[in-house]
Every structure is written in C-alpha cells, then in structure tokens.
C-alpha cells in the first residue's frame, strides 16, 4: 500500500514538473502575441531586400510602407499566408531599446538560421531595427545580434491609401496574376476572386506570397471586378472595374476601396 502511495505521489510530482516546464517555455501565441527573437538584414537604413518573397518589389521602400517592413520566420511567414500582416514590436532585451512600439508589415521570408531555430523570429529591415532604439543608439542595437522583443498582431492601417493591384510581368489574358497591396485591417487575404467582363467570379490561387493567379482555358477580357475576403475577419469587399480592358503587364491599378 505504501509503495503504491509513493508511486502515485511521484507520478503526481512528475506531472506537475512537466506542467511547470511547459508553462515556462510557452511564450508564444503565433496568431496573437508573445516574445520573439529579432535580427535585421539589408542596409542600415534600408527596407531589408528590394522585393522579398511576398512579391511586393520596390514598393517596400516607398509610401505607405516606408521601409517599415520585416521578414518573418516560418511561423509568421506561414508559407506566404502571412504576407501583408502587421505586427507591433517592442524591444525589451538590450540597454539601447527605447521601449516604444513600432509597427511593421511582413513582406519577406526568413527561412534559416535563428529564424528557423526559434518558435517566432522577426527579421527586421535596417530602418525598422533602428526605430526600436533610443535616440542616437540605433547602431548599438543593430550590432547586438539577436535581441528579445514583445510582439503582437496589429491591424494594418495605411491612411489615405486604397488597395492596389500590380500586374505580374508575365501576365496575359490566359494567365492573369497580380500582387495585392496595402490591405487595411487583417492585412492578409483568405480568398481572391476575379470577374471578367460578362462572366462570373472565378477563384484565384495564392502563390505562397501576396501574388494571386488564375490559369484559364480561354482568354479573359476586362474590365475586371476583384472580390477580396480578408484572412482573419473574413470581411468581403469588391473593387469594381479596377483592372481595365486594356491592362498591361507590370502596371499597377489602384482601387477606390479598402477594408
């Protein structure tokens, strides 16, 4: 009887210790908030890379993004589904940290190194990394290696900007593809549909980025309506006649809508 009691006591102690270890290490909620490691890449005052895995191209350095962008580790990039999402980041792990929050948009992928070894990792642009620092201490923060931050998912807000559709350089009437840029709110999309002139809405395929495409068996003619469904809240908006009948590859077309 005594040995049985000791066995159950040890079992209970083991279960408690397991629970304690789990709680100590559980510092993330990928969909919401937690702590993460942060590094930076590219030029000290730059936008990380010109373009990146999400397909935004040179737009990352220009308004309304202003180079306040980041590559996401696997959990945040999420096979491209994280493109366009926004995160508030507060630096906590270095004396040069200002403690003031910044907001960045995920525009690129960081697949290796510390990005892959941590549950959540944020690889900031040089400009965004400097924005985490106290005045005059940006270089100290950039030279610190991996620092710790608090992060949380934030609503994207591009004031005075509506959604833009930038046609892919290889797009044609049989293969229509474009990047969707500057979505307010969730920042990501769960569904994109295109409606050609005189036709019905056709679901498009996300290309592990902010690029969406449709391969049609026949030529699609514009003008095109585009119906967008946001990723988290599933709000739906329609950009009517946003891509004209005489559209051209590598051109951008600005809508009059946003979430």
Curated annotation (Swiss-Prot):
Record: glycosylation sites: 25
Residues in Expansin-like CBD domain copies: 174-255
Record-linked InterPro entries: Expan_Lol_pI (IPR007118), Expansin/allergen_DPBB_dom (IPR007112), Expansin_CBD (IPR007117), Expansin_CBD_sf (IPR036749), LolPI (IPR005795), RlpA-like_DPBB (IPR009009), RlpA-like_sf (IPR036908)
Cell location: Secreted, Cell wall; Membrane
Disulfide bond sites: 54-83, 86-156, 91-97
Role played: May cause loosening and extension of plant cell walls by disrupting non-covalent bonding between cellulose microfibrils and matrix glucans. No enzymatic activity has been found.
PANTHER family given in the database record: EXPANSIN-B3, EXPANSIN-B4-RELATED
Listed name of the protein: Expansin-B4
Native organism: Arabidopsis thaliana
Name of the coding gene: EXPB4
């Amino acid at each position: 009887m005594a040995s049985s009691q000791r066995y159950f006591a040890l079992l209970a102690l083991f279960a408690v210790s397991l629970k304690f270890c789990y709680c100590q290490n559980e510092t993330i909620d990928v969909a919401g908030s937690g702590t993460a490691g942060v590094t930076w890449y590219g030029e000290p005052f730059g936008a990380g890379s010109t373009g990146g895995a999400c397909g935004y191209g040179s737009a990352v350095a220009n308004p309304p993004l202003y180079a306040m962008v980041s590559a996401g580790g696997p959990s945040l990039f999420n096979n491209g589904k994280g493109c366009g999402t926004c995160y508030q980041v507060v630096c906590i792990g270095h004396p040069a940290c200002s403690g003031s929050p910044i907001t960045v948009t995920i525009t690129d992928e960081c697949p290796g190194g510390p990005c892959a070894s941590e549950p959540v990792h944020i690889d900031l642009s040089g400009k965004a990394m400097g924005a985490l620092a106290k005045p005059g201490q940006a270089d100290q923060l950039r030279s610190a290696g991996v620092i710790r931050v608090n992060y949380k998912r934030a609503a994207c807000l591009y004031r005075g900007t509506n959604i833009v559709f930038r046609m892919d350089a290889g797009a044609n009437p049989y293969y229509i593809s474009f990047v969707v840029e500057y979505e307010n709110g969730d920042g990501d999309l769960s569904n994109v549909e295109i409606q050609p002139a005189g036709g019905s809405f056709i679901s498009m395929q996300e290309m592990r980025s902010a690029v969406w495409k449709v391969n049609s068996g026949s030529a699609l003619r514009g003008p095109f309506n585009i119906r967008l469904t946001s990723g988290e809240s599933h709000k739906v908006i329609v950009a009517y006649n946003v891509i004209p009948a005489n559209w051209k590859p590598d051109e951008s077309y600005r809508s009059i809508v946003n979430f």
